[in-house]
Amino acid sequence: MEKIIVRGGKRLNGTVRVEGAKNAVLPIIAAALLASDGKNVLSEVPVLSDVYTINEVLRHLNAEVVFENNQVTIDASKELNIEAPFEYVRKMRASVQVMGPLLARNGRARIALPGGCAIGSRPIDQHLKGFEAMGAKVQVGNGFVEAYVEGELKGAKIYLDFPSVGATENIMSAATLAKGTTILENAAKEPEIVDLANFLNAMGAKVRGAGTGTIRIEGVDKLYGANHSIIPDRIEAGTFMVAAAITGGDILIENAVPEHLRSITAKMEEMGVKIIEENEGVRVIGPDKLKAVDIKTMPHPGFPTDMQSQMMALLLQADGTSMITETVFENRFMHVEEFRRMNADIKIEGRSVIMNGPNSLQGAEVAATDLRAAAALILAGLVSEGYTRVTELKHLDRGYVNFHKKLAALGATIERVNEKVEEVKEQEVSDLHA
């Protein structure tokens, strides 16, 4: 078993560059299945385990996929298979994003019910509601969901009960080849939605209104391969913003898009963090003393749920009582118990977490419960006394490229070790950046 060992006490300084956005690239790779003519070439693709997984799903579906030098080339011009099996989908719920493209191309899709992070139930009912509105019949059973349409999908007016990002993406992709116009209301507004729409349009689709609550998709007969560059990862950028703030450091985050970070920036400035927009990205300077604030996660442009656990680590260092309320996913507080192991004064009250600070955190052995919790525990380790050992790194690798190496380059005392060689003594780790 691999672990990340971090010793607290260092201010982080320097420059770090964020990768292409994980939450943008996965639905875009899935949407590449829509192109029945030509190759799609995607650049700025992060080297993540989830990207390898979705690539394997596409290969199983009979697409040709080459991934090298942060570039993915996809040829989906051959006849596609219709089934994405459990062995792939169990690893990552984003695999369900192939359903809309398969349904549009083949008129049929059979997908194992999805896996991924253990964050509540995260149902796909809104996806299926959209497919049914466009004329598909849906059956769920034996661990699979199957959708099929006689003839072709038809444009429809669809209202989402909740602005689900995944449902917006899946329905938008399916509607590109439907007959007629689809109007998707109460759609998600995330930057990743806009990125997918830009890719679809580059392939020849007619998508308008992405980034607003109403998206119009006029169906076309065929889509073609295109070139597209993935937007920068706003969650990775936000994570390094917290790294600067929590250590009282000074970090320039290159390739960050300030407009995508407004809600994060607003809350951090409220805490006393100095944030400067520069041509290269965003510079973050941590204060000597952090102020307590309250945060409520919301769909975009509200505060992103994917930054909740990282901000929790930061608020543990704030002076006073802070509260985070989670409105997007249930059961996304599994990391609270791990923070308690580090001596945090923190408690759960319903859908909220109350923190009293500042906390004198102590290093401990902790387990990542999901992707963002993995990053949050490492961030907490940066300001803990002694050594923090974080396990279950499979979660971290789903969303961060060389996270420990990037932190080390900024001055953190941190190493990733394999348990077999963890006779690497604490002193050796402490000497890493002496």
From Swiss-Prot:
Key words of the record: Cell cycle, Cell division, Cell shape, Cell wall biogenesis/degradation, Cytoplasm, Peptidoglycan synthesis, Pyruvate, Transferase
Segment forming the signal sequence: none
Regions that span the bilayer: none
Binding site for phosphoenolpyruvate: K22, N23
Biological pathway: Cell wall biogenesis; peptidoglycan biosynthesis
Locations listed in the record: Cytoplasm
Residues found modified as 2-(S-cysteinyl)pyruvic acid O-phosphothioketal: C117
Covalent S-S links between cysteines: none
Annotated UDP-N-acetyl-alpha-D-glucosamine binding sites: R93, R122, P123, I124, D125, Q126, D306, V328
A GO cellular component entry from the record: cytoplasm
Alphabetical list of InterPro entries matching this protein: Enolpyruvate_Tfrase_dom, Enolpyruvate_Tfrase_sf, MurA_subfamily, RNA3'P_cycl/enolpyr_Trfase_a/b, UDP_GlcNAc_COvinyl_MurA
Principal location: cytoplasm
Active site: C117 (proton donor)
Molecular function GO labels: UDP-N-acetylglucosamine 1-carboxyvinyltransferase activity
Catalytic activity: phosphoenolpyruvate + UDP-N-acetyl-alpha-D-glucosamine = UDP-N-acetyl-3-O-(1-carboxyvinyl)-alpha-D-glucosamine + phosphate
HAMAP family associated with the record: MurA
Family, similarity comment: Belongs to the EPSP synthase family. MurA subfamily.
Protein name per UniProt: UDP-N-acetylglucosamine 1-carboxyvinyltransferase 1
Species this protein is from: Bacillus cereus (strain ATCC 10987 / NRS 248)
This protein's encoding gene: murA1
